[in-house]
């Protein structure tokens, strides 16, 4: 990766991270750029022709604390394509309590893809990649954050519904439900 490409990618990723308004993002851009350089070195000819369809990710574990809950760890998964034109950020608690049977829930806090890239299918591929990586980390249910809940009838609503995201009814007999868009990655837990 040339220095000019590295600087441009860093600028785009920094802009995406700044838009999330999170305060734990130190080191993420450097690690994503390192992942991009490693991935670029082993690209196939076909992948090299369309780098916007090749995704890289970085998982960061952070320590959190508040007076009510005490301390806990939180995982932050960031995902972007090699061109840095699409970006997603997801948080999930790595803890699973087998006594309470709480599912591990992932929360998509940022999902940025342009309309042009969405038309190419990059958005759908990115969310499928995010789901696969989340499931690999043991996430049972993937939620779209409250701030991202689309208005009914909009393309975002139709798109998320088409990807299998939905809302449970208030009297859902399953042991866990939320009134926001979500998708079950693992049916039994």
Predicted regions and their residues:
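Short, high-confidence coil segments that cap the C-terminus of an alpha-helix
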Residues: 137-139
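Conserved acetyl-CoA-binding loop-helix of GNAT-fold acetyltransferases
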Residues: 113, 119-132
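Active-site rim helix/loop that mediates acceptor-substrate recognition in acyltransferases
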Residues: 24-80
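Conserved acetyl-CoA binding element of GNAT-fold acetyltransferases
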Residues: 102-115
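Conserved beta-strand-loop-alpha-helix junction that forms the acyl-donor binding cleft
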Residues: 143-157, 173-175
């Amino acid at each position: 990766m040339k220095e000019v490409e590295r600087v441009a990618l860093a600028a785009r990723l920094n802009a995406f991270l700044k838009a999330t308004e999170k305060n734990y993002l130190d080191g993420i851009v450097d690690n994503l750029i390192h992942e991009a350089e490693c991935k670029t070195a082993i690209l196939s000819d076909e992948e090299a022709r369309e780098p916007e369809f090749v995704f890289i990710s970085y998982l960061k574990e952070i320590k959190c604390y508040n007076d009510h809950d005490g301390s806990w760890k939180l995982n932050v998964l960031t995902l972007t394509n090699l061109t840095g034109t699409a970006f997603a950020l997801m948080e999930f608690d790595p803890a699973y309590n087998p006594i309470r049977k709480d599912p591990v829930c992932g929360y998509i806090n940022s999902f940025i893809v342009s309309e042009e890239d969405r038309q190419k299918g990059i958005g759908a591929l990115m969310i499928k990649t995010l789901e696969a990586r989340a499931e690999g980390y043991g996430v049972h249910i993937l939620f779209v954050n409250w701030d991202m809940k689309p208005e009914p009838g909009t393309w975002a609503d139709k798109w998320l519904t088409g990807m299998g995201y939905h809302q449970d009814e208030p009297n859902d007999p399953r042991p866990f439900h939320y009134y926001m868009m979500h998708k079950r990655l693992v049916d039994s837990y």
